[in-house]
Amino acid sequence: MPLRLIFMGTPDFAVPTLRTLAAAGHQIVAVYSREAKPSGRGMKLQPTPVAQEAERLGIPVLTPKTLRTPEAAAEFAAFQADAAVVVAYGMILPQPILDAPTFGCFNLHGSLLPRWRGAAPINRAIMAGDPEAGVMVMKMDIGLDTGDVALTGRIALTDAMTASDLHDALAPLGAELMVEAMAQLERGELTFTKQPEQGVTYAAKIDKAEARIDWAKPAHAVLRHIHGLSPFPGAWCELPIEGEAVRVKILRCELAKGSGEPGTLLDDRLAIACGDGAIRILQLQRAGKQPMQAQDFLRGTPLQPPLAVC
């Protein structure tokens, strides 16, 4: 018998899970998402990606500012859900919310717990040079991503993979895992494993202040920094263009041959020296412009070495 579910999520990452649960035949009685925000040139209020998908599916959407009032808890409990599915909702669930569904609340988290608990696991896994990443279905408790784990999906990481690439790979994988978890829950077969006490790390929210590239670091670290922050907020540097230092986001790069003073342009194909080795820019973006492949950028803005990149 299909489950009565409450779905709680906000960004694009959560949409495949909502869509797949609905396609699996579960009765999604309500969707909780964050409030609409001004967006675009006209700064019109734009519902979240999850709210838009819920409206397309004909599911009621709730966007409370808080879940910590008795009224919010009563409204949540009134749905008499078997379970709540939480994917990047963006709000901490208080104990009355966690306790309301018959079988509890289940979170899809984008890391291999207990590594990278917290807000930015995808970015931090790439920035740290982890060999693999993944998603886990866990039963939520009051702690920060400390619940018992039910199912795990893994993806090998490569030097070429950006945070955007990993996001797009984990979202559908996570959707499949959550559908399987709900199927096992429905059959009374879902089992859990406690997280190890060793290996706990925290994925702090990305701060724009950490986005500037430090060319004194080894090339591999610079590459991971760039790819871990791509596309948002975007690792940046200043290129000397027509006598001015112009801020440019670097979205994709590769390791390159060569060496020199860190931050020196080594050739006419955007190879830049790092503290050890070099990287070559493959994709970049100027402020207010669309992302460009490096070869297209160089057609309009040829740069000749040696130049100092800040």
Swiss-Prot record:
State which residue ranges cross the membrane.
Answer: none
- Which of UniProt's keywords are assigned here? Protein biosynthesis, Transferase
User: Which Pfam families does the UniProt record give?
Assistant: Formyl_trans_C, Formyl_trans_N
Q: Show the catalytic activity.
A: L-methionyl-tRNA(fMet) + (6R)-10-formyltetrahydrofolate = N-formyl-L-methionyl-tRNA(fMet) + (6S)-5,6,7,8-tetrahydrofolate + H(+)
Q: Sorted alphabetically, which InterPro entries does this protein's record hold? A: Fmt, Formyl_trans_C, Formyl_trans_C_sf, Formyl_transf_N, Formyl_transf_N_sf, Formyl_transferase-like_C_sf, GART_AS, Met-tRNA-FMT_C
MF terms (GO), sorted A to Z: methionyl-tRNA formyltransferase activity
The residues that hold (6S)-5,6,7,8-tetrahydrofolate are: S111, L112, L113, P114
A single GO cellular-component term from the record reads:
cytosol
Which EC number(s) are documented for this chain? Answer: 2.1.2.9
The residue range of the signal peptide is: none
Please report which protein family the annotation says this sequence is part of.
Answer: Belongs to the Fmt family.
Q: What the protein does?
A: Attaches a formyl group to the free amino group of methionyl-tRNA(fMet). The formyl group appears to play a dual role in the initiator identity of N-formylmethionyl-tRNA by promoting its recognition by IF2 and preventing the misappropriation of this tRNA by the elongation apparatus.
Question: What protein is this chain from?
Answer: Methionyl-tRNA formyltransferase
From which organism does this entry originate?
Rhodopseudomonas palustris (strain BisB18)
Taxonomic lineage of this organism? Bacteria, Pseudomonadati, Pseudomonadota, Alphaproteobacteria, Hyphomicrobiales
Encoding gene, per UniProt annotation: fmt
